[in-house]
Structures are given as structure tokens and as C-alpha cells.
Amino acid sequence: TVLLVQPNAYPKVIQIGSALEDLQHAVDGDIEAVYPFEDSVGVICNEEGKLRGLPANRALRDEGGHIYDVIAGSFLVVGLGEEDFCSLSAEQIDKFEALFHQPEAFVRMGHSITAVPIPDSVLQARDEHRDAPKLTHSSHDDR
């Protein structure tokens, strides 16, 4: 049980295999594991996400709340076992779902990047538009 964090979406708790191919599929490419937190968790992201132009997803911040990196593309938050990745505990799921809950948009201002939370209303409107039935136009007259 891990957390999948996709761009412009709320995190999802998912079940995933621990094979390399499973992790690569989840992040759409070769994986890179980073360990930005004191907790026994890792972040698995696409190694070439920025180079491939994957959408900016979430910011990583230091203790002072300053952005030091932005993850591009989907990523996983996974538990750390003695020798490999493992499931997150319920407490870890709660903590990191809260940390990464709100999708972010990014704005470059001079030499820095600012993360702006995407309001729930914008996400809901997008989802409603995406889920709305599509109207089709007939190419002939039905009279």
C-alpha cells in the first residue's frame, strides 16, 4: 500500500507490486528514489521527468517552507524496509496524503519558483467538464 501522487490530482492510496517494472509503470519511465524526509519513506519519481517535460507536480520544501525542488510527473511515496521498499503505515499514509493533498500550479518569478495551490473549485469544475456527456453532431438532417 503506497501513495500515488499525480499532477493536478489528489493523492490516491494504491496497491502496487514491488517489482521494478511495476514502479516504472507507475511513474512512466525509469525510476529515481529520493529520501527528502526524516520518516522512513522514499519518493519514487521518473528519473528523467524534468528532461522529458513531464508536468510539474508537487514542490519539495525545506524546514522553513522554501521550495528547493519540484517533482515532475507522477510519483509514489513508499515505505522503506530493511532492504527494499514496502507498504506505508496508516500513519504515514495520513501524514503524506495531507502533505501532498492539494495539487499545485507553479509560477516562475525572477530566479525563483512559487507554488500556488489549485483551488478545489477549479479541480471540481475540471472534473465535471471531463465527466459531462459529449454531444455529437449528426452530419445529416434527421427531418
Predicted regions and their residues:
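Non-Sec secretion/translocation targeting segments of pathogen effectors
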Residues: 130-143
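N-terminal nucleophile
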Residues: 1-129
